[in-house]
Amino acid sequence: MSRIGKREIELPAGVSVELASDAVVVKGPKGQLSTPTHPKIAYAVADGKVQVSRTDDTRVARAQHGLRRTLLANLVEGVSKGFTKTLEVIGVGYKVATAGNTVSLAVGFSHPVDFKLPEGIEAKVEGNKLTLSGIDKVLLGETAARIRRVRPPEPFKGKGIKYENEVIRRKAGKSGGKK
């Protein structure tokens, strides 16, 4: 039995889970999210808790068991609390600004890079930090990764866009002497 899959999901106050034939819909104070169901996974809602179980013991069912439980737990947390991810822009002259649903990055190119945020993701800038927030953890992570990919941190000086708590492995520069 999957150690993650067999744990129950507690539903906070104001969060409801509806089971449809092809999706699980989670509604809460911050919005509504859904995830597709899998034919080998069964869901049961009772007493403010959701139990995820598998219909048989095949390899596919075992693989999906923990995954589907975690996806559902992320939806429950998203519609009740929401998620945030912070990126840091490090480098001389590197700047970040927001205008509506667009993030403008000046990160050493000859032009600023304008990044359009997907629906449901909000951005806030404080100095050199860009804080992204939203209710969908998967979409938030993808968006943060796409912004980081514009100028990933380089190992020599550490310049670029990095996650707030990311540790950059630094390399020594050229060490050859003059002849």
From Swiss-Prot:
Superkingdom per UniProt: Bacteria
GO molecular function, one term: rRNA binding
Keywords associated with the record: Ribonucleoprotein, Ribosomal protein, RNA-binding, rRNA-binding
Disulfide linkage: none
One GO cellular component, as annotated: cytosolic large ribosomal subunit
Biological processes annotated in GO: cytoplasmic translation
Pfam families (alphabetical): Ribosomal_L6 (PF00347)
Residues forming coiled coils: none
Signal peptide: none
Oligomeric and partner information: Part of the 50S ribosomal subunit.
UniProt similarity note: Belongs to the universal ribosomal protein uL6 family.
PANTHER family assigned to the protein according to its UniProt record, in alphabetical order: 60S/50S RIBOSOMAL PROTEIN L6/L9, LARGE RIBOSOMAL SUBUNIT PROTEIN UL6M
Function statement: This protein binds to the 23S rRNA, and is important in its secondary structure. It is located near the subunit interface in the base of the L7/L12 stalk, and near the tRNA binding site of the peptidyltransferase center.
Cross-referenced HAMAP family: Ribosomal_uL6_B (MF_01365_B)
Protein name: Large ribosomal subunit protein uL6
Lineage: Bacteria, Pseudomonadati, Thermodesulfobacteriota, Desulfovibrionia, Desulfovibrionales
